[in-house]
Amino acid sequence: MHGALSLETIEPRAVLEDDVLTDLRVEDKDRAQELIEDLMIAANRVTVRYLEARSLPSLRRILRSPDRWQRIVELAAHLGARLPPEPDAAALEAFLLTRRQADPVRFPDLSLTVVKLIGRGEYVVEGPDQKTSPGHFGLAIPAYTHSTAPNRRFPDLLTQRLLKAALAEHRAQYSLEDLNTLAQHCTEQEDNASKVERRVQKSAAALLLESKIGQRFDAIVTGASAKGTWVRILHPSTEGRVVQGF
């Protein structure tokens, strides 16, 4: 999608054979998947614009301008690039594209660092009498919502209900107070789900590597400090802190 940050994070999926974990595999994204994602973003933008044009409330998906932008500037400087002193999505995207071409193997690690520094997304309510949405920094657009996956995300279901009421010219079944409460709840539950996902991924990695103690793997050092050295094993796709080595 034009203007969106070209980030590439690794999301390994568990491979099971007869209910036994045998691998953690990263599926390569093809152009068809990228096209589907672009269409979903376009649909979300049209949905929120439709509700806004009719002065109806909407549940916005936002990503604020990063408070830790200076850390991103320092990261870019360490890699020989310059970013402006104030948050600038277009400049960050140009930097990311350059780094993807220069070092594709380590680009996912850079992307993950940038994602952490930018911060998490949130849900907020926007309505005729409540203008609070700062837009979506990662997509570089002023108005965005989630609406294309009502089967697995409650915010999408809420938006579908608001859209259905608007199309039928009925009053929305949620007041602004209701929507504000639901927006906060959805943000909190998303954070909780993300924590569980990370713990499950770490548990799966530990379970898979338990039988591989003593083996050698190709890996990339992703970080080092007084607390230790962190590496990402290329295959199976896992990462963690080195606790013993030479």
PLM feature spans:
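Electropositive polyanion-binding surfaces
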Residues: 1-246
